[in-house]
Amino acid sequence: MLLQPESSSKPRNDSPPGFKFHSSCDTCLKAKIKCSQAKPTCARCLQQGRQCVYSPYRKIGRPSTKNLPLDQLQQPKGRTAGGTARRSLSRRVSLASPGIENGSRVGNVRHATNRVLHAQESVLVPSQTWSDQELTGNINRLDYGLEGTNWSALEGLLDASMSTLPQADHELASAVPRLDQVHDLDPNPGQEDLTGYLSPSSLSSRESLATTFPPEAEAGSFGLSSEFPFSAGYSLGTGPVLSESLNAFPVLSSFPSSASSPVTEARGFNLLSAPTDRCTFQCYPVLINILNDMNEFQRKSSGLPLDVLLNLDKRVRKVHETILGCPCCLVSCAAALTLMLITMVNINLLSLFERSCGSTDGGSGSSMSRGELNVAPRIAFGGGNYAGQDRSRNPLPYTTGHLTLGNIHLDETVKLVFSRRLVRLYLERQLGVVQQLSQLLGRVEGDGASIKVTQDLLRDQLRRLEHFVGFITLTD
């Protein structure tokens, strides 16, 4: 007699091993009614036209040992006193290990967890954690170490800035350090030398001052007097505008001028951003070189021709735009000192313009105290008849060079009008620069000495600029 196998009441389950499905479909389980348990569609889902889905059971508890590898089955299963700590560490490692996420089964995850656990037990390396304050300090710290900088070479600049408020310009000039003192700005004393980051052209800028310009300029441009040991890079002709010291870094020509865009949001930088790298523009050495050049002019002469002043102003504007695009020198911990140096350069340039007012033939007359502009020439040039007047004393910076339009030499009347217009444009541009620097200084956090000195210098510069503009208006 043949024995037939008993038919099971449960539906046949063709699922892969390790998965067990519900006997009733999801629709019947949700409605809490009896399911016909027919596959692939039960009677109720077939009648209502719904999709019949049988969901697997949710695994509860520890996984089955049938899916574990052979080497795991051979390990002893005895419990130890450290079993609880082992399981706790295993769970932490399984969550923190990135390679375990690729495992598809619980057994593989357990096997990978045990391997990571053995590696953690053999070599235990403590993880280094940083607090928020330490991270902030590490981000805001410059690579070249401003904290350990020896600022002894800048003490003369700071003292000179404070002493210029009641004193004359030559006292400020005497306090500016020489170019050979730039090595005192070494950010890491005893380890590195700043001359390693300076190009040979930057180091030879002082020798370029000894190169005298030809006594008479070519026709078609303002002439430079041979009395001033000025480099050929300052000419208004076809030569380069910037001196050799500025060739050490690229000029950011994409930035607009300070007069056209006094608002700093258009430049796209943030004073509180972290430095990206070491300063590649050599902003501080370039500013020191410019101050040294101004010191030479103030020491050798009481006034400069207008063409020299305008070229010097163009050089300062190029450096100003480049420094405002430097992410290292305008970081929060260095912005105050950078803005103070820029303001000192602008004030020294304004002093050169003031000293050139009332000079004889553009640079060889008597010197004037700062802020004491000579208004007597208004009487000499009254009535607008400039051509027949005596040019022995000039109310504004002036040059003896010829002003040409093509091949035509313009007379002194037209040249005087152009000179006054150029000086007025310089003053209006400087008013925009003062406003821009004031906005940048307002974003710097803290109340250090550099911020207070810069605020005083900006107020003094604004007062002198307004006085200069009023003087030009009165002499028109």
UniProtKB/Swiss-Prot annotation:
Entry's Gene Ontology cellular component terms: nucleus
Pfam families in alphabetical order: Zn_clus
Main localization (coarse): nucleus
CDD domains: GAL4
Keyword flag Transcription regulation: yes
Bias (Polar residues): 64-77
Cellular localisation: Nucleus
SMART domains, per the entry: GAL4
Region (Disordered): 63-92
Record feature DNA-binding region, as residue ranges: 25-52
Gene Ontology MF annotations: DNA binding; DNA-binding transcription factor activity, RNA polymerase II-specific; zinc ion binding
Keyword field: DNA-binding, Metal-binding, Nucleus, Transcription, Transcription regulation, Zinc
Stored InterPro entries: OAF3, Zn2-C6_fun-type_DNA-bd_sf, Zn2Cys6_DnaBD
Source organism superkingdom: Eukaryota
PROSITE patterns: ZN2_CY6_FUNGAL_2
Biological role: Transcriptional regulator; part of the cla gene cluster that produces clavatol and ortho-quinone methide. The clavatol biosynthesis cluster cla and the terrestric acid cluster tra are both involved in the production of peniphenones and penilactones.
Protein name: Transcriptional regulator claA
Species this chain originates from: Penicillium crustosum (Blue mold fungus)
